[in-house]
Amino acid sequence: MAMLEDRLLIWRLKRGHEPAMARVYAKYKNLLLKLACGLVRDTAAAEDVVQDVFVGLAESVDRLKVGGSLKGYLIQSVLNRARNLHRANAVRRNGNPVTEDVPATEEVRPDRWVLHHDQLQHLHEALRQLPPEQREVVTLHLRADLTFREIARLQNASINTVQSRYRYGLEKLRTLMNSEFES
């Protein structure tokens, strides 16, 4: 059903139907932002990546060729822009990790917030230490809820390779996180 809706949206986009762009944005904005945050670990940069993807989509809609799903196309666009950002910032890799918001509850005490904040910083630092291929697979699987088959298509790799990258990435994250809490 989603594929059918996406094909209809693409058809409408190519014919200049403005509400179709609004629907694509509403449908995929949160997923793409969550994915971009996991890949670039900076909220402002992630928002820029997602905005660039939608601006690029709007500017190139007349030449748009989506081989698979619109979701896959947009995810691949976010991946490409995040990779470009990493390459552009290769010299400045020592920035601060993103801190995600603590879930809003009335009972968030300062000591719990500090603990949550510290754990998130350590997790982001551990993610930063993963090889790019492993970090990408872990992020796509856990944050964007993509299957290994979908990730394999996006990375042009075999499913076994993607599963291995995921497994090794989780093992390394576990080791890095445990070493922090033991020290």
Each language-model region and where it sits:
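N-terminal module of bacterial RNA polymerase sigma factors
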Residues: 1-31, 38, 128, 149-150, ...
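Helix-turn-helix DNA-binding module
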Residues: 128-136, 140, 144-164
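Arg/Lys-rich amphipathic alpha helix in sigma70-family domain 2
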Residues: 59-66, 76-97, 116
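Internal acidic/polar
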Residues: 2-6, 84, 92-116, 120
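Conserved RNAP core-binding helix
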Residues: 9, 25, 33, 41-60, ...
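Structural recognition of an alpha-helix C-terminal capping motif at a helix-to-coil junction
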Residues: 34, 48-55, 68-80
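C-terminal edge and immediately downstream basic/flexible tail or linker adjoining helix-turn-helix-like DNA-binding
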Residues: 2-3, 12, 41, 93-96, ...
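Sigma70-family region 2
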Residues: 14-15, 41-42, 51-69, 88-90
